[in-house]
Amino acid sequence: MLLWPGASGLPPPRIFPSLLVVVALVGLLPVLRSYGLQISPTASTIRGSEPPRERSIGDVTTAPPELAPESRPVNHSFAEHSPKARKAFPVLGIDYQHVRIPFEIALWILLACLMKIGFHVIPTISSIVPESCLLIVVGLLVGGLIKGVGETPPILQSEVFFLFLLPPIILDAGYFLPLRQFTENLGTILIFAVVGTLWNAFFLGGLMYAVCLVGGEQINNIGLLENLLFGSIISAVDPVAVLAVFEEIHINELLHILVFGESLLNDAVTVVLYHLFEEFANYDRVGIVDIILGFLSFFVVSLGGVFVGVVYGVIAAFTSRFTSHIRVIEPLFVFLYSYMAYLSAELFHLSGIMALIASGVVMRPYVEANISHKSHTTIKYFLKMWSSVSETLIFIFLGVSTVAGSHHWNWTFVISTLLFCLIARVLGVLGLTWFINKFRIVKLTPKDQFIIAYGGLRGAIAFSLGYLLDKKHFPMCDLFLTAIITVIFFTVFVQGMTIRPLVDLLAVKKKQETKRSINEEIHTQFLDHLLTGIEDICGHYGHHHWKDKLNRFNKKYVKKCLIAGERSKEPQLIAFYHKMEMKQAIELVESGGMGKIPSAVSTVSMQNIHPKSLPAERILPALSKDKEEEIRKILRNNLQKTRQRLRSYNRHTLVADPYEEAWNQMLLRRQKARQLEQKISNYLTVPAHKLDSPTMSRARIGSDPLAYEPKADLPVITIDPASPQSPESVDLVNEELKGKVLGLSRDPGRLAEEEEDDKDPDGGLTMRTKEPSSPGTDDVFTPAPSDSPSSQRIQRCLSDPGPHPEPGEGEPFIPKGQ
């Protein structure tokens, strides 16, 4: 087995992409020589039957024996034993015509896959040039090579494009459509898709008609309806080109869904305008009734396509109820019903793209609830593979068809088309955004408007519609096709290659590479429920209200019909958590892992016993991506989504806790004691009060109703906060302790009475003013002699500010016990 050095970390050789191209082109040699293989002239044919196949051995070609005419008698026994009638047994033969069609299809798909591998091997090229541009270049080279050997290159037929290549891309986009971003911005998307496409078609068609009038003899015979038809073809944004470019630059979700949603939903407008102007071009006179019918056909085409898609989506979801015993065919129903929806819409000239999107969006939640996880993985990767191959073939065939098609070049018409396309796109985006921002909460910034206008790429849909034009009714279809190809190449090459550096230059927000956590998903749903309740209270019925209505209807009626078994009841999160724990415990018992778990059920004890265990040695292995995705899916489906009237509680219905008050008082005393010890240890006390000023009456917490109401028998103290002498806080030092420290003489009996009176019934600390002992005399403290050592020490302590105060030391003390 050959080993490639790139697998061990070494860069791949530069010649590797060239070798892939050479291998693909060598494989095309049978296709190039297919027209040169002819039947041997010696081979005879039987009338009304298939001609006999020629056989070859080495370089010698032999033909089947010539049959005798019917009128001539033949001796069968002689013919059987005659040595001239027998030929050597053919060991090897060549019959390319027998396998030509499937061989060429497989060869083109192989070429597309090899090209994708070759482009991504060299990161410098893939980081500068988009993949779509490189595929078109490969198509041009292959087309030129086929034409250089004298053969006719294949052309991208419109039937092949619309019936086989386009549906996988649209189904992949519709089935995995980010529904939340799409529904939240649906109004903006519809305005850009409908009004913007109409503006581009009529603006471009009118200006091109004016150019044709003054452009010269070659184009002055193109009428107004022909120019309007051309404008409707070239005005639509192509979803294939948008996907190919925007997936590589990783633009943020808002801009991506606006541009991509516009490219999906403008299909109805494009189909209606295309058929309308194509029919009007054959009329001698167009009346008002025809215009009204054409206007009504827009609603029929768009809404009819949505209806067809919804019907097939419901049928697919209902069918998936009965596939629990046959899991193998589950992915097949998704592909078949979606494709049938597209074909049914095209059968009635409805919008097939709208039908595919509607069917994918409708069937996905119910189908995924019924099918297994392996079937979901199969659907996901098969759709991604199918759409990627189709996209690659489209761009390659676009380059090949450019070489093979017939063109008619006119500088005036082509340059005017390119210039007016850019002007119409810019003016349309600016005008519509100015109107949309009046109603949006999150406004579209000028940077967003520039990216939306710059991301209007054209692609293979416009080419296929232009190729469908009949030369008998539209003699200038070659000129139209040349102008369409020019616009496609300009938007894909110039705009597609420069949009990445422009996004980096403008610092446009990009898409988050990491997936949202389960915590974020839970809080997102919580905010949705909260906004729904706010809308109900305000009486404003926004999209949250209608979304909740649809969810309730879906849970009550639709899920019971389309989802099988108990999965339609959507159990509560706690019940599901118990089921998950039970399942995990059963797995541990079966695997024999319970022997490693200690007998204690506490998680903390497990952490203490195995504090340094490596992640690989843990009992429970890490979750895989599939397991994590399954948990996300189950949580997303089982979270509470309904707005039920729960039991409301207030302070009158709550049961009182008998230990709550005692616990709060204990916390209050503990905090007061801690505050007292902190002040004494740091010598941080307020300056001594003047002897002629009474102290505060009480010190209580803020919740006490008597905190700021002095008693009647106590003097009222008025404190001016602006005065520098007003204390900022009340010292909570015990009066007895303070008196002992200062050496003050107090009457012991009097002091005991005051202590008895100062006791607060609720356990708080109370401070009272000193009442006079006799009328006319102020009972004040008698200080000790100033020359005593204790007095000198306390004066130094009071005058010295001490160490730096801690944070919050000078602020009033408010307990936090409550």
From Swiss-Prot:
Sequence ranges on the Extracellular membrane side: 1-98, 149-158, 216-222, 284-287, 342-350, 405-410, 470-475
Residues covered by region (Interaction with CALM1): 633-818
Activity control note: Activated at acidic pHs. Inhibited by amiloride and 5-amino-substituted derivatives. Inhibited by cariporide and eniporide. Phosphatidylinositol 4,5-bisphosphate (PI(4,5)P2) and phosphatidylinositol 3,4,5-trisphosphate (PI(3,4,5)P3) bind and differentially regulate SLC9A1 activity.
Residues with glycosylation annotation: 75
Sites bearing Phosphoserine, chain numbering: 599, 602, 605, 648, 693, 697, 703, 723, 726, 729, 788, 790, 799
Cytoplasmic compartment residues: 122-130, 177-186, 250-252, 323-328, 372-373, 439-444, 506-818
Primary location: membrane
Record GO biological process: cardiac muscle cell differentiation; cellular response to acidic pH; cellular response to epinephrine stimulus; intracellular sodium ion homeostasis; positive regulation of calcineurin-NFAT signaling cascade; positive regulation of cardiac muscle hypertrophy; positive regulation of the force of heart contraction; positive regulation of transcription by RNA polymerase II
Positions with biased composition (Polar residues): 785-794
Localization terms from the record: Cell membrane; Basolateral cell membrane
Molecular function GO terms recorded: calcium-dependent protein binding; calmodulin binding; identical protein binding; phospholipid binding; potassium:proton antiporter activity; protein phosphatase 2B binding; sodium:proton antiporter activity
Region PI(4,5)P2-binding region: start-end pairs: 509-516, 552-560
Keywords: Antiport, Calmodulin-binding, Cell membrane, Glycoprotein, Ion transport, Lipoprotein, Membrane, Palmitate, Phosphoprotein, Sodium, Sodium transport, Transmembrane, Transmembrane helix, Transport, Ubl conjugation
TM regions (residue ranges): 99-121, 131-148, 159-176, 187-215, 223-249, 253-283, 288-322, 329-341, 351-371, 374-404, 411-438, 445-469, 476-505
Region entry Interaction with TESC, spans: 503-545, 633-818
Catalysed conversion reaction: Na(+)(in) + H(+)(out) = Na(+)(out) + H(+)(in); Li(+)(out) + H(+)(in) = Li(+)(in) + H(+)(out); Li(+)(in) + Na(+)(out) = Li(+)(out) + Na(+)(in)
Miscellaneous note of the record: Predicted models used for more than 20 years predicted 10-12 transmembrane segments. More recently, the structure of SLC9A1 has been solved and reveals that SLC9A1 possesses 13 transmembrane regions.
Function (record text): Electroneutral Na(+) /H(+) antiporter that extrudes Na(+) in exchange for external protons driven by the inward sodium ion chemical gradient, protecting cells from acidification that occurs from metabolism. Exchanges intracellular H(+) ions for extracellular Na(+) in 1:1 stoichiometry. Plays a key role in maintening intracellular pH neutral and cell volume, and thus is important for cell growth, proliferation, migration and survival. In addition, can transport lithium Li(+) and also functions as a Na(+)/Li(+) antiporter.
Family: Belongs to the monovalent cation:proton antiporter 1 (CPA1) transporter (TC 2.A.36) family.
Subunit structure, as described in the record: Homodimer; dimerization is crucial for its function. Oligomer. Interacts with CALM in a calcium-dependent manner. Interacts with TESC. Interacts (via the juxtamembrane region of the cytoplasmic C-terminal domain) with CHP1; the interaction occurs at the plasma membrane in a calcium-dependent manner. Interacts with CHP2; the interaction occurs in a calcium-dependent manner. Interacts with EZR; regulates the cytoskeletal interactions of SLC9A1 and promotes stress fiber formation.
This protein's name: Sodium/hydrogen exchanger 1
